[in-house]
Curated annotation (Swiss-Prot):
Quaternary structure and partners: Heterotetramer; composed of 2 small (MOCS2A) and 2 large (MOCS2B) subunits.
List of residues that carry 1-thioglycine: 98
Compartments, record wording: Cytoplasm
Protein name as catalogued: Molybdopterin synthase sulfur carrier subunit
Keywords: Cytoplasm, Molybdenum cofactor biosynthesis, Nucleotide-binding, Phosphoprotein
A GO-annotated cellular component: molybdopterin adenylyltransferase complex
Biological processes, Gene Ontology terms: Mo-molybdopterin cofactor biosynthetic process
Phylogenetic classification of the source organism: Eukaryota, Metazoa, Ecdysozoa, Arthropoda, Hexapoda
UniProt-listed Gene3D superfamilies: 3.10.20.30
PTM per Swiss-Prot/TrEMBL: C-terminal thiocarboxylation occurs in 2 steps, it is first acyl-adenylated (-COAMP) via the hesA/moeB/thiF part of MOCS3, then thiocarboxylated (-COSH) via the rhodanese domain of MOCS3.
């Protein structure tokens, strides 16, 4: 094993989709979604990128969605998120109102 490399760890999270994201992917939730992390950590941007790889329909709204980790908004997607099996990741597009 090379020095300086963190071990890759796969965690399984539960995804929740709201509003437009739910319409695009055709479901409101998906359990046991695998995320490859670096020692249990992954940036919000990488989490969203992995979700968009699995659900390419979301690419159209990727730049406007917010993600939440265990009901806490991830305001800075460059920050690492500490992830564990069973955590909840919500994909929340902007809600239009009138």
């Amino acid at each position: 094993m090379s020095q300086g490399h963190r071990s890759e760890e796969v965690v399984r999270v539960n995804l929740l989709f709201f509003a437009k994201s739910r319409e695009l992917v055709g479901t409101s939730s998906l359990d046991n979604f695998p995320l490859a992390t670096s020692g249990g950590h992954l940036s919000g941007s990488a989490v969203l990128g992995t979700i968009c790889e699995r659900f390419p329909e979301l690419v159209a709204i990727r730049d406007s969605v917010i993600i939440a980790h265990n009901e806490q908004y991830c305001e800075d997607l460059t920050e690492p998120i500490s992830l564990a099996d069973g955590d909840e990741i919500a994909v929340i597009p902007p809600i239009a109102g009138g």
